[in-house]
Amino acid sequence: MNNARPIRRALISVSDKTGIVEFAQALAERGVDILSTGGTARLLAEKGISVTEVSDYTGFPEMMDGRVKTLHPKVHGGVLGRRGQDDDIMEQHGINPIDMVVVNLYPFAETVAKEGCTLADAVENIDIGGPTMVRSAAKNHKDVTIVVNAHDYDRVIAEMDANEKSLTLETRFDLAIAAFEHTASYDGMIANYFGTMVPSYGENKEGDEESKFPRTFNQQFEKKQDMRYGENSHQAAAFYVEANPEEASVSTARQIQGKALSYNNIADTDAALECVKEFDEPACVIVKHANPCGVALGKDILEAYDRAFKTDPTSAFGGIIAFNRELDAATATAITERQFVEVIIAPSVSTEAVEIVAAKKNLRLLECGEWTTKTTGFDVKRVNGGLLVQDRDQGMVSEDDLQVVSKRQPTAEELKDALFCWKVAKYVKSNAIVYSKGDMTIGVGAGQMSRVYSAKIAGIKAADEGLQVEGCVMASDAFFPFRDGIDAAAEAGIKCVIQPGGSMRDNEVIEAADEHGMAMIFTGMRHFRH
């Protein structure tokens, strides 16, 4: 049975007019009659395309400043009418079959994102007729084609040319799924926007914690990649991304070469890239199992890489390397000659570096683009039966935010190192301890249930690599509940500690620092990472 349906009449009404003139022209050239509304009809007519206004077809004018345009039985009957079943009643009421609906919706998201957007502005950008037509056409995909994305225009024309001006059921069904996804996303955005106004009517109060999180949490992501497996081989997995991510990230990165990214590759690459973004100077971050195992600054990224690698060469094997400058030939050579690496990610990659890395055909090389600022948003963590939703941790202190609580003031070099290792500690799994000196990590203790043991591990790591802890700065992602961590740090040779403060025993901890002649800095900000 032939399931193809010829396209003889199309209704076109779009807010985003990207490519619509060319698409409508192509349809007209293939004998398709075009119905249209408002601005779309005017644009097509101006371009010399024959168009019938919907109001002329229905005999009912657009009204209420365009609020009512397509909500008419002659429109929806033409879209919803089942071919071979509803033909008689359609003819009886003068309803012509509409074979294709081309619609995208009012720009609600763009409107509410604008500074100064009022509730009235938002309300006027809630599309009613558009989603109704989209859902009607998608529901009747057995006979009708729905097109909501401009990137499908060429595909539709190509299939019409290859199939006697018809489209197959497989294509119509695929486009219908895209249409339902489109309206689901649209309604989700509206629900989220109004959900922030609960419980009272009015404008969203920015900064009001009660209204920041809507009553229902609606998010939509597009599948970018199916994976061989997830975190473990018995788990199925896929990678989904936001529809239009604004910030340079692993989600937006272009893969230049290498094997397909695995679940763990993506998680680790995200950790490495987000860490390296914290630094303005040329920086390198090496990550293993979502923890930085080596971080350093340098006069260029080659020096930064060399120093980061020295922190923990053993853990760096099979790791992820992120840079905040273009990957150049010298650095690419150093990496490929020195170690096995799973992924390298950088804002850009030189032509020479691409050629060098090509010798390691399995090495995944990613180019993510430049970044300026970090976008706001939510972090989401699944628990059994629910989601934990919070703001992204974009907090970071500057020198002006620091409070020296010890008798001894930190030296200029200690202060610089303190800020450096505080940035690193933010990206180490709690309990996190980082030793650093001269803008280079010396030891990293991650993920221990005891903060003291994280400190011990950082010292063991440093000793194993022949790195000198004496004179280092220590960063702790959260406060020290007892003085034992400071005593252990002093015994290891730590001279300066940076930590959030806030313990009930802060005075005892500060006294311990003073007894050991250490400088102690409070940030007033914690960076738990679980």
Swiss-Prot record:
Reactions it catalyzes: (6R)-10-formyltetrahydrofolate + 5-amino-1-(5-phospho-beta-D-ribosyl)imidazole-4-carboxamide = 5-formamido-1-(5-phospho-D-ribosyl)imidazole-4-carboxamide + (6S)-5,6,7,8-tetrahydrofolate; IMP + H2O = 5-formamido-1-(5-phospho-D-ribosyl)imidazole-4-carboxamide
Keyword Cytoplasm: no
Pathway: Purine metabolism; IMP biosynthesis via de novo pathway; 5-formamido-1-(5-phospho-D-ribosyl)imidazole-4-carboxamide from 5-amino-1-(5-phospho-D-ribosyl)imidazole-4-carboxamide (10-formyl THF route): step 1/1; Purine metabolism; IMP biosynthesis via de novo pathway; IMP from 5-formamido-1-(5-phospho-D-ribosyl)imidazole-4-carboxamide: step 1/1
Annotated ranges, domain MGS-like: 1-148
One GO term (biological process): 'de novo' IMP biosynthetic process
Single GO MF descriptor: phosphoribosylaminoimidazolecarboxamide formyltransferase activity
SMART domains: AICARFT_IMPCHas, MGS
Annotated InterPro entries: AICAR_Tfase_dup_dom_sf, Cytidine_deaminase-like, MGS-like_dom, MGS-like_dom_sf, PurH-like
Keywords for this protein: Hydrolase, Multifunctional enzyme, Purine biosynthesis, Transferase
This enzyme's EC code(s): 2.1.2.3, 3.5.4.10
Gene3D superfamilies hit by this protein: 3.40.140.20, Methylglyoxal synthase-like domain
Entry GO terms, CC: cytosol
Domain statement: The IMP cyclohydrolase activity resides in the N-terminal region.
Family of the protein in this entry: Belongs to the PurH family.
HAMAP family the record matches: PurH
Name listed for the protein in its UniProt record: Bifunctional purine biosynthesis protein PurH
UniProt lineage: Bacteria, Pseudomonadati, Pseudomonadota, Gammaproteobacteria, Vibrionales
Gene behind this protein: purH
